[in-house]
Each structure stands twice: as structure tokens, then as C-alpha cells.
């Protein structure tokens, strides 16, 4: 091969190598700009709990660059299924006894607890009495009908001296487990989401903070009696086995478990919340 041909081949190779390097450099420079910001989709209940969670979203954005999208629910039927199927990355609305029962009944075997939020105490509310001693013979008391919150409400009624249960440590007690009922109270099981709205039709209703807050009630100003702060029913953040350690999930937890979010919860629930972390 002549010297000119060798020189030509070398020149073409050098130009190709330079072009390749420039292309890779351009790709390397452009890559960060093409990356989408970190995101997470979380299911929460509408009302005050959503407002509290929005404060966590602000912190997540400021500290971790995490965009939080909330999907709002009005009842407890769908959020766990949505996480299990991958429609949501996580949810924050329930306590462990509810998760256990819901997962068992629906066959949701991929859900895991990744963090705690708050204890939201149950309380008894009434438009007719200000003290349980004023409840008349045969008074009607509305309680949530989902298994975990039904037992929780019955245990709370027992602590007020209104009934006695066969086993007050059973977190899934039902009305048939009432062994003493001195005032012959009528225990009316209603959908958890409408318990607060039943106050016009019953003498007293046991309601959780989620739904009490939706109708403007809080434990401090309106509760006839309130669940004690040592309640084991701490609310939780739930994700899946396959994403529980993901950065977006972990950063959302860290954003929620902050003093700022606690203060926001105190503001909306009037001291009716207890830190769960």
C-alpha cells in the first residue's frame, strides 16, 4: 500500500474516532436534562388528612426534589388494591389491623408497612348528650362496620362502662361478643364513611378522625369521649414488596415524619393526633 493511501486511511479513522467522542460527549452532557424529576403517587383520604399530607409533599419537593401526586379517596375500599396493582406507589390512611384484614379478605399478599404516621383517636360524638351518663335505656349507638374499626369502637365503649366484651384484647370483636349491656343499648353498625353523618338519626356515634374532620368535628371541641393516646392503632404508610426500598418511597416517609407535618396535623385535628414515629 502506498504512503498516500496509508495516510488517507489513518486520517479517516482519526476523524471517525473524533466524531464518535464528540457524539458521546454530547449524549453525556444532554443526559441529565432528559431525566424526569423523581415522582411518587400516594393514596390518601380526602379532608384534613389530605391537607396534612400536602405539607409532607412540600417538604419532599424542597428537600428531595420529589414530586408527590395525591389520589384522593372517600372511603377505605380501594386504596390497598390500587397499591397492590401498581396504580399507586403507596398509601397513607389506615392502621395495621385494617391492613391485615383487608389484605386477607382480598388476597393482597404484596403489601408491606414502610412507615408510621399518627394515631388518630376514635371518639364518641353526639347531638343529644354531653356525657355517657345521659344515654337513656335503649339508646342507639352507631359504630363503624369494617371489622377492625368495629372492634376498636366496641373496646372504646367498654372503657366508658357502657358494655362488656367477652375478650377486650380481641382486635376483631363483633357485636355478638358483647356479654353485658346494662342499658340495652342498640349497637347499629354503619358504613365507616357515613358514621359521622348519622348523628341526626342516632343518640351517639363512634367516628374516626378522618370522617369526623370531613364534617367539621374534632375530638377536643366535640368529643363526648375520646380514645386514649396509648392506642395501638397507629396509622401507617403502605407500599409493595417490590418498591418498599425505592428512593421515592423512602424520601416520602422522611418528609412525612417531620415536626412540620406534626404541627400541621395538630392545627387541623386540635391536639387529636399523636406521633407514631
UniProtKB/Swiss-Prot annotation:
InterPro entries: Lipoprotein_NlpA. PROSITE patterns: PROKAR_LIPOPROTEIN. Belongs to the NlpA lipoprotein family. PANTHER family: D-METHIONINE-BINDING LIPOPROTEIN METQ, D-METHIONINE-BINDING LIPOPROTEIN METQ-RELATED. Its main location: membrane. Residues 1-19 form the signal peptide. CDD domains: PBP2_lipoprotein_IlpA_like (cd13598). The keyword Membrane applies. A lipid is attached at residue 20 (S-diacylglycerol cysteine). Keywords: Cell outer membrane, Lipoprotein, Membrane, Palmitate, Signal. This is Outer membrane lipoprotein 1. A lipid is attached at residue 20 (N-palmitoyl cysteine). It is found in: Cell outer membrane. GO terms for cellular component: cell outer membrane. It is a lipid-anchor.
